[in-house]
């Protein structure tokens, strides 16, 4: 395929119940494309050791925090793309992505975020989602993931119950207008100075960051690099050294089938082990 982007393959068991492994499906797809379609193979991206191996031996426990994992990958694959969006203007190698993460971490600190604080992300599959997660983990904050389909009562409950201090959000998704929703929950926002929100219904929320439109009372994503200049990188590194693999780094809310949604607290170790089992 003469295509510079990427192809995603989805294997759904119900479509082929006689197959018990996606390991059968994907090689057969590659063989078909090679036999019947004009293809162009790309060279394998080698690691810095020239081995092409995994960063860790398979079946080995990843005993590191997320910042340590990112540093390891940057060292081994300095020229490999971490992100290459086809429709959004965001292409970064791993070291370039880490630089963006560090700058966002500095901006969070400049806004008053501290180790243990909760930062919520209300967005789809955009670069800001990943940057927010990795920046939060770098300074010991907890990322609160928000369902993109949430309506006003659901997001208000989550932000209040999670004690979120900073919210990063896109403008809208499908029929949910996030800006309208947050202004309805926090009518004080439009008259507030960015970073100094004092909302009666969400007393812990101080910072709202918009990724697209500029909204009164909110920081805009493009302004964050200037805010980051107020904090030296050494402060990020100082906090990073205090983070333990058993520290909570992510709060995911349940669906609330039998009651109100509950926040599930996940540590660096929980997630790295879960991902290792999923892709290993």
Give the predicted meaning of each segment.
Residues 62, 79-134, 151-156, 220-229, ...:
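Conserved AMP-binding/adenylate-forming core of the ANL superfamily
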Residues 139-226:
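Structural core segment of the AMP-binding/adenylate-forming
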Residues 1-40:
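Histidine-acidic metal/acid-base catalytic patches
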Residues 119, 136, 248, 254-257:
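Conserved S/T- and glycine-rich ATP-binding loop of Class I adenylate-forming
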Residues 46-47, 69-93, 212-216:
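AMP-dependent adenylate-forming
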Residues 40-64:
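Flexible, non-catalytic linker and terminal segments flanking ANL/adenylate-forming cores
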Residues 254, 276-280:
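Conserved small/polar residues in nucleotide/adenosyl-binding loops
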Residues 78-81, 201-205, 210, 216-253, ...:
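Conserved pre-ATP/AMP-binding loop-to-beta segment of ANL
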């Amino acid at each position: 395929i003469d295509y510079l982007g990427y192809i995603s393959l989805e294997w759904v068991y119900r479509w082929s119940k006689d197959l018990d492994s996606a390991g059968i499906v994907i090689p057969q797809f590659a063989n078909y494309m090679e036999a019947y379609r004009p293809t162009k193979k790309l060279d394998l991206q080698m690691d810095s050791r020239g081995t092409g191996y995994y960063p860790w031996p398979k079946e080995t426990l990843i005993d590191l925090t997320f910042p340590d994992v990112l540093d390891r990958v940057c060292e081994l694959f300095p020229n490999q793309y971490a992100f290459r969006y086809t429709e959004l203007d965001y292409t970064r190698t791993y070291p370039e992505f880490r630089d963006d993460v560090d700058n966002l971490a500095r901006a969070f600190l400049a806004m008053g975020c501290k180790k243990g604080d909760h930062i919520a992300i209300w967005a789809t599959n955009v670069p800001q989602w990943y940057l927010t997660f990795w920046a939060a983990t770098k300074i010991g904050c907890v990322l609160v993931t928000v369902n993109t389909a949430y309506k006003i009562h659901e997001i208000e409950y989550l932000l209040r119950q999670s004690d979120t201090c900073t919210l990063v959000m896109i403008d809208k998704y499908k029929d949910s207008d996030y800006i309208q929703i947050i202004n309805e929950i926090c009518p004080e926002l439009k008259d507030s100075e960015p970073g100094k929100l004092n909302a009666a219904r969400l007393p812990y929320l101080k910072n709202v960051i918009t990724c697209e439109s500029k909204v009164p009372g909110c920081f805009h994503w493009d302004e964050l690099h200037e805010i980051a200049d107020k904090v030296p990188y050494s402060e990020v590194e100082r906090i990073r050294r205090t983070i333990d693999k058993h520290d909570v780094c992510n709060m995911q809310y349940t669906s609330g089938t039998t009651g109100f949604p509950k926040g599930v607290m996940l540590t660096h170790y929980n997630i790295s082990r879960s991902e290792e089992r999923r892709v290993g």
